[in-house]
Amino acid sequence: MDRLTVRELSPEENKVLVRVDFNVPIKDGKILDDIRIRSAMPTINYLLQKRAAVILMSHLGRPKGTGFEEKYSLQPVVEVLEGYLGHHVPLAPDCIGEVARQAVAQLSPGRVLLLENLRFHRGEEHPEEDPTFAAELSSYGDFYVNDAFGTSHRKHASVYHVPQAFPGRSAAGLLMEKELEFLGQHLLHSPKRPFTAILGGAKVSSKIGVIEALLSQVNNLLLAGGMGFTFLKALGKSVGNSLVEESGIELARRVLKLAEQRNVRIVLPIDVKVAKACEPGVSWSETLIDQGIPADLEGLDIGTKTIQEFCKIIDASATVFWNGPVGVYEVPPFDQGSMAIANCLARHSSATTVVGGGDAAAVVALAGCTSQVSHVSTGGGASLEFLENGFLPGTEVLSPAQD
């Protein structure tokens, strides 16, 4: 690590402002998966053992940024947090203003305070419009710790601007350190070979940077999901009514040419599950890509032959990175391809298997294989940006490590 870590701080009896990522899925006021809260506990517990007063700040969802919205309140997080800590955690009704300042002032060493959703204020996502937002957050702590790997690819106030107010006193949390070291060592600097990356999801354009970066790293690149259909169309295949990013077709051709130059094998679906609509109980069938998808049908998942081919390549790999589902996993049976990949990764215990957060992490959790994968990242977009650039905006602004 070339940045200061939380273990190098002296937080005793001081207030520590900690950016966590508690952006958890919530339904009817209940948290569906608390992995992000669980993942932050080592840093929180470490600071409490050091007798620090811990001020947690996070966003949740995408509120309008015009004030409190009940459905985006961090209130459901409090109960889970209290369960892990074993003591009461107050939730400040706001993250700035007099109520927040009072809550911070009353916080004792060895206790935790959670500030309300940062994104209730426009200044979080648009710091240039309201510089006072970052300035007020900065005033709460003696030290700053970033443990929100999943948000550190964004130049938001709490991630990018606040730490700059703590020269020599801003550090990476334990989760952040673990993410950067694992991804850096096993994917960027010295991956065991053969190295295979599997990319799903909808758009080529949003992943073009990481695709081009991976082409200088991997031996095999498996492409599926909506992105796969864009590549298939670029090769002149008939993809029917499947999701295609028309503006990405030229990008796909560029990638195919670059892969050839770099001797990287790109593998696309050879068959797909097709249906007239993506809805539960719909009639579906499997179609070979070479036979073409009929105009009134859309591809919604990879087919049996593609599953077999993808799993064969995974089994022969020493390092595997997966980001993005290969089908519409929320609607069975179009979850079969993604589930098969999750199970294949779990079985392949001799390889280093890395799941790049987001929907792929959700699939692995649904398949019950999270513990059998080498590393499930807490950041989808962040893991991709780290692979693309080798750094994240939110880590670059932390204090340099001391020699």
From Swiss-Prot:
Catalysed reaction equations from the record: (2R)-3-phosphoglycerate + ATP = (2R)-3-phospho-glyceroyl phosphate + ADP
Location within or outside the cell: Cytoplasm
UniProt keyword Nucleotide-binding, yes or no: yes
Residue numbers binding substrate: 21-23, 36, 59-62, 119, 154
Record's GO cellular component terms: cytosol
Endoplasmic reticulum is among the record's keywords: no
Pathway membership: Carbohydrate degradation; glycolysis; pyruvate from D-glyceraldehyde 3-phosphate: step 2/5
UniProt-listed Enzyme Commission number(s): 2.7.2.3
Primary enzyme class: transferase
Principal localisation: cytoplasm
Molecular-function GO terms, alphabetical: ADP binding; ATP binding; phosphoglycerate kinase activity
Alphabetically ordered keywords of this record: ATP-binding, Cytoplasm, Glycolysis, Kinase, Nucleotide-binding, Transferase
UniProt GO BP: gluconeogenesis; glycolytic process
Binding residues for ATP: 207, 299, 330, 357-360
Record's subunit section: Monomer.
Similarity annotation: Belongs to the phosphoglycerate kinase family.
Name by which UniProt lists this protein: Phosphoglycerate kinase
